[in-house]
């Protein structure tokens, strides 16, 4: 395989400023991709752009986007086409976890928090798909971020789990709709990944799980995953090495669910 398998390919990413999105952007840049990066954190996007252009000598544009707002998402994708002339792939990785995760059940669910979590995670993915599929090149590829919580239920996790289940439904629907154009749509389902979002979630409940502790999940590999490891999966699904994979929800959880 070429060390630059994404040369001349244009890839759009949401959630690019931190965690899995950040590591995916860096990996794709190292493999020659031309990137259109979106996030709500504009300063961090600019830092990533400067680092990717300097280190990998690739073309990068950035846009501050609230994925809950379709107008902003569509304007970002139109900007991508204006700058690069095409869109070969996208990774919709923007996401948030609720402050009440692990603390409040459905009866106690704050509805403003519900709307925010569903808005970013589920509506944000829908908005991204809607804008991207209007312009996606034939034989393109899209990766959406679901979660282990999109595959299994968990108490006191209503908004996040519902959103992540919904993303799998969106992914399967999109795959059926655009398969005739050779466009593939898949979902990744990470487990415990060491990211700022995981740290924030654990801080909110005052519980920091450590491998080997009594309350650590039954993860076969006995550790948290790294964002770089998930980025490798995203890159594979965007690449020409996965051309017969579509409509899939792929776990990357260290053997948590097995």
UniProtKB/Swiss-Prot annotation:
Q: Which domain of life is it from?
A: Eukaryota
Example GO biological process: abscisic acid biosynthetic process
- InterPro entries in UniProt: NAD(P)-bd_dom_sf, Sc_DH/Rdtase_CS, SDR_fam
Q: What is annotated as the active site?
A: 146 (proton donor), 160 (proton donor), 164 (lowers pka of active site tyr)
Record's note on what induces expression: Constitutively expressed at a low level.
This protein's pathway: Hormone biosynthesis
Q: Which PROSITE patterns match?
A: ADH_SHORT (PS00061)
Q: List the disulfide bonds.
A: none
Name by which UniProt lists this protein = Short-chain dehydrogenase/reductase aba4
Species of provenance:
Botryotinia fuckeliana (Noble rot fungus)
């Amino acid at each position: 395989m070429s060390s630059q398998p994404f040369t001349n390919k244009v890839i759009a990413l949401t959630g690019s400023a931190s965690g899995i999105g950040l590591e995916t952007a860096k990996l794709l840049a190292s493999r020659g991709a031309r990137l259109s990066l979106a996030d709500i954190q504009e300063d961090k996007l600019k830092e990533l752009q400067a680092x990717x252009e300097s280190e990998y000598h690739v073309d990068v544009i950035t846009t501050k986007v609230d994925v809950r707002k379709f107008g902003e998402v569509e304007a970002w994708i139109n900007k991508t086409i204006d700058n690069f002339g095409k869109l070969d792939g996208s990774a919709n990785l923007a996401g948030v976890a609720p402050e009440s995760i692990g603390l409040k059940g459905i009866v106690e669910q704050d509805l403003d928090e519900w709307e925010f979590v569903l808005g970013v995670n589920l509506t944000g993915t829908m908005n991204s798909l809607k804008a991207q599929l209007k312009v996606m090149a034939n034989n393109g590829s899209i990766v959406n971020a679901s979660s282990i919580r999109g595959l299994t239920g968990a108490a006191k996790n209503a908004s996040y789990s519902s959103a992540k289940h919904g993303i799998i439904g969106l992914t399967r629907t999109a795959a059926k709709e655009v398969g005739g154009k050779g466009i593939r749509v898949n979902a990744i389902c990470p487990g415990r990944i060491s990211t700022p979002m995981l740290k924030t979630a654990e801080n909110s409940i005052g519980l920091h799980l450590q491998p080997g502790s009594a309350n650590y999940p039954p993860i076969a590999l006995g550790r948290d995953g790294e964002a770089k490891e998930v980025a490798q999966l995203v890159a594979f699904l965007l690449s020409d090495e996965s051309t017969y994979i579509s409509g899939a929800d792929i776990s990357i959880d260290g053997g948590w669910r097995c």
